[in-house]
Curated annotation (Swiss-Prot):
Region Disordered, annotated ranges: 112-142
Entry's Gene Ontology cellular component terms: cytoplasm; GID complex; nucleus
Biased composition (Basic and acidic residues): 131-142
Organism lineage string: Eukaryota, Fungi, Dikarya, Ascomycota, Saccharomycotina
Coiled coil: none
InterPro entries recorded: CRA_dom, CTLH/CRA, CTLH_C, Fyv10_fam, ZF_RING_GID
Native species: Scheffersomyces stipitis (strain ATCC 58785 / CBS 6054 / NBRC 10063 / NRRL Y-11545) (Yeast)
Family (UniProt): Belongs to the FYV10 family.
Domain CTLH as annotated: residue spans: 201-259
Residue stretches of biased makeup (Polar residues): 117-126
Keyword entries, A-Z: Cytoplasm, Metal-binding, Nucleus, Zinc, Zinc-finger
GO MF annotations, alphabetized: ubiquitin protein ligase activity; zinc ion binding
UniProt keyword Cytoplasm present: yes
Stated name of the protein: Protein FYV10
Start and end residues, zinc fingers (RING-Gid-type): 430-496
């Protein structure tokens, strides 16, 4: 697909409907449980009054008033759940309407003018059917008018939403969330922003994540686990073990060894029994069992370490050997921040699985797709291409050609998007080479954009490619010089002015 189409945008924005849908399902189940609980309670209260006709009237009135008060509380909870359901449905409607706007920015494209006629070849019936189905899909698709100013505004809104999504999720401050501040600011001029992003859920997600990573507090993640316990149990989640593991190590850090041992026997020991796992959850059993084995060694480490600090005289020879062993010091890692990283990763994995969304930020996904379509092997720096060296004539037989400016090419302190363009007195505007996007783009694949625009292209040893006719037929300015070189079996690079033997040139066949 070379042009943005309507179907592409519908497919790429389908994930924004998952969270409201899951929240509606969850809220509906909450309403069901609320109604069933209230129904049972009212039935029991009425039956209790009927079974005891001799109860004094005053007591009966008190029981009725209590039931009425309970029912009023039920009504308030029910109204709040209904309002929440209406809010979630309004978000779905707003997103459908917002996505439907791009259907007004489409153009009718005559594909028959752009398609190249293919020679008729015998095809099987299956191939013919597949081609017709693919052709039908393409014919039903619509392409967007990129010159439409309303479409540009629509894209700008989408970009703002992606930025808000990233800022809300990646916030590390506890006093305020900069993503929410930006959302409120933009909503003053465009109120629909509040309906197009699930800011409240992402804020809750960020609070739990920050409480784990920054505050090392388990209160919020425990509450989230209890709220979604049924789903996590069905999904074979290991979050409960990670929480209990962190609680155990926190008790060890505080010095409550006896309390930690008691907590471990109740909350961690069952994870060592394979019968407590499902058949599809063997991987978690092996992982948890290995970590449980380390707990015993950690207690020994804490005991010997405490003995070493409290006693002034020499400790036992065996204990001294144990302290100096490499394995002994590995237990120090158990009390590092790695456990909080593991817990946060487990929480993120379960959160994204619950709502069917990606672990990566949506803005990174779009940026990666765009950068992958632009990335070439010339991005950052290319040690083979001598265009990045000083523009001077060097004989190819001189070995210094490959050593000159080697420090600039290999030293990390010279890495940067503009280092080599400074050598050329040019400005590098490539987004792939920009310092802001370097880390995101460095692991992306190269774009398959290499096409031959030359007739009979040849690659020189320095990496530059030219049509062979241009190398053999120089301009009038360098005619005499080139003729002299050709008689010697050599050619000159028109750009870098380097001289090479013709035999060292290679015929290339770009895709």
């Amino acid at each position: 697909m070379s042009e943005p189409s309507l179907n592409f945008h519908i497919q790429s924005h389908s994930t924004q409907f998952r969270i409201p849908t899951e929240l509606i399902k969850k809220n509906f189940k909450t309403i069901q449980k609320l109604v069933e609980k209230q129904k049972k309670q009212m039935t029991d209260d009425v039956a209790k009054i009927k079974k005891n006709p001799n109860i004094p009237t005053a007591m009966k009135l008190a029981m009725v008033r209590k039931s009425i008060k309970s029912f009023e509380g039920f009504q308030k909870k029910l109204q709040a759940s209904i309002a929440k359901d209406e809010e979630l449905r309004s978000r779905l409607i707003a997103r459908i309407e917002h996505l439907a706007l791009i259907s007004e920015y489409c153009i009718t494209q005559d594909k028959t003018k752009t398609q190249v006629e293919k020679p008729s070849q015998p095809q099987s019936q299956n191939e013919d059917t597949e081609e017709k189905e693919h052709s039908t899909k393409d014919d039903n698709d619509k392409y967007l008018d990129l010159h439409n100013p309303n479409l540009i505004t629509w894209y700008r809104d989408q970009t703002n939403l992606l930025i808000i999504d990233y800022l809300i999720k990646s916030n590390t401050r506890t006093d305020h969330n900069i993503g929410l501040l930006l959302l409120k600011s933009l909503s003053e001029s465009n109120p629909k922003y509040m309906k197009l992003i699930d800011y409240d859920l992402f804020e809750s997600f960020n609070k739990v994540y920050v409480s784990i990573m920054e505050d090392h507090d388990l209160t919020l993640v425990i509450a989230w686990f209890n709220e979604n316990r049924n789903f996590l149990k069905k999904a074979n989640s290991n979050l409960e073990f990670e929480i209990n593991y962190c609680r155990f190590l926190s008790l060890i850090e505080k010095g409550d060894v006896n309390e930690a041992i008691k907590f471990s026997s109740i909350n961690l020991s069952p994870y060592g029994n394979v019968s407590n796992y499902q058949d599809t959850d063997r991987a978690n059993h092996e992982h948890n069992l290995n970590r449980l084995k380390e707990i015993g060694g950690l207690l020994v480490y804490m005991a010997i370490n405490e003995e070493k600090r409290t006693r002034n005289d020499k400790i036992a020879f065996s204990s001294n050997l144990l302290i100096n062993s490499p394995r002994f010091h590995e237990y120090e890692k158990l009390l590092s921040d790695e456990r909080w990283d593991s817990l946060s990763m487990c929480f993120v994995e379960n959160f994204t699985k619950l709502y069917g969304i990606s672990k990566n930020y949506p803005i990174f996904i779009y940026l990666s797709a765009g950068l992958a379509s632009l990335k070439t092997k010339s991005c950052y720096h290319n040690t083979e291409n001598t265009i990045f060296r000083e523009n001077q004539e060097i004989n190819v037989t001189d070995e210094s050609i490959y050593k000159k400016d080697l420090t600039v090419l290999t030293d990390k302190k010279y890495r940067g998007s503009n280092q080599y363009y400074k050598l050329l007195n040019k400005i590098n505007n490539c987004p792939v080479c920009s310092p802001e996007l370097y880390k995101l783009s460095r692991n992306l694949p190269y774009a398959q954009l290499i096409t031959s625009i030359f007739n009979n292209p040849f690659k020189l040893p320095n990496g530059n490619i030219y049509p062979f006719d241009k190398l053999l037929n120089p301009s009038e300015k360098y005619l005499s010089e080139k003729n002299t070189l050709l008689r010697m079996g050599k050619i000159k690079d028109p750009l870098t002015r380097e001289i090479f033997l013709i035999d060292t040139c290679i015929r290339v066949y770009p895709a």
